[in-house]
Structures are given as C-alpha cells and as structure tokens.
Amino acid sequence: MAFGLDTGVENVVRIKVIGVGGGGNNVVNRMVRSGTRGVDFVAVNTDKQALNVSSATYKIQIGEKLTHGQGAGSDPEVGRKSAEESRAQISKALEDTDMVFITAGMGGGTGTGGAPIVAEIAREQGILTVGVVTKPFGFEGRRRMQQAEKGIEELQGKVDSLVIIPNERLKHATDQKITFANAFEIADDVLRQAVQSISDLIRDTGFINLDFADVTAIMKNAGMAHMGVGRAAGKGKA
C-alpha cells in the first residue's frame, strides 16, 4: 500500500485575509511584500488615501457616505456604522471563501468598530472565521486600551477563533529595541507572522500536513487561541 502527501489542498481551500483599518491594512501590505502565496488579500478602510496605497488585490472603502473617505477619527462607532453601510460590498468580497482571517489593530476607529461587522458577515456566509488582532502599547493611552478591550469582546462573539497579540509584551519577544518610531512596524510584523503561520499550515505540503477538515475541527467555535513567537539563530535553527 502506497502512502502519499495530499498536494491538492492549494486548489481546494480558498483563503482570504481581510485587513480592517490602518493596522490591518499594514499586515496585508506586509504579507503581499513577503510573497505569501495561495491567499487573496482584501483591504477594508474608511480612509481613501490609505486604500490608494494598499497592495491588496481587493479594496473596499466603507462608510463613504458617513466619512467621505476621511477615516473614522479613532471612533469605533463610526467604524461600526461604516461597515454596516457597506455590508453588501463586504459580503460580495467574501463570496467563494472557505476560510477568512480578519486582522486589525484594536483601539482605533475603523478596525475596532468594523472588524466585528466583517466577522459577522463572514459567519453568516458559513465561512470559517479567524480574528487576529493586537492590543495597544501602554504608551498609546488608557482610552485606546479601553476601546480595544471593548472591541475585542465584541469580536470574540463573532469569530470561530480569536488570536490576541498584546503589543506591550513584544518588548520581551524581540531582540530589537522597541522605540516609538519602530514599535508599530514590529507589531504589524508579528501580526503578519500569526496569520501567515496558520495559513502556511494549511497550504504547505511537508512532513506535517493539515487538511482543511482538521483545521475546521480545531478552530470552529474554538473561542480564544494562543500564539507563541519564537526566535532561533545559528546552525540547525528550527
């Protein structure tokens, strides 16, 4: 009896990564630049200028009537209403999708308010929905943290699995000195790693190969998930 590795996954599982708001859009741009394959990218924003420079294949300007393309002004309620206004566009972008990653930097307006609506629409369409979000750095202030926590609580009820990356802990997970100038760049890259590591497990054929049924069984209605960030250097690094 012969045993073989399943190489047909890439042609079957349709994965989309949707970046909502500034932080989410940054993750999408990083994944595109890193050459991530087999995934469709969608950028969702209230800020028209941010969408103009996005590397995503699909771009959705939400809340055009409400915000006139000028952003949500760090107000999650504006982000929520903008996503509600554009439900039809979001739903259209999610057609023919098996799994979606919704990524956002929580604490601002568009990502915090819009991500739960995007997740709600995805779940309504029967899509396996995974949220991957960051919590703010301490220096971003109490108000932003409170908004993030409220947004995360709302998002948790709309997704199958939710990965939360507390930016403040990145100080202990990187050799780089975190400064105000590079803090968000490092946070965006960790967010990218989180999304890419899960999608690669499904996409890549190797010694460990998860088929989509395995992933669905693990992540469907799983609630909170945890992610570790590791570093390796030198000969034989893993």
Map each language-model feature to its residues.
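Tubulin/FtsZ superfamily GTPase core signature
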Residues: 1-238
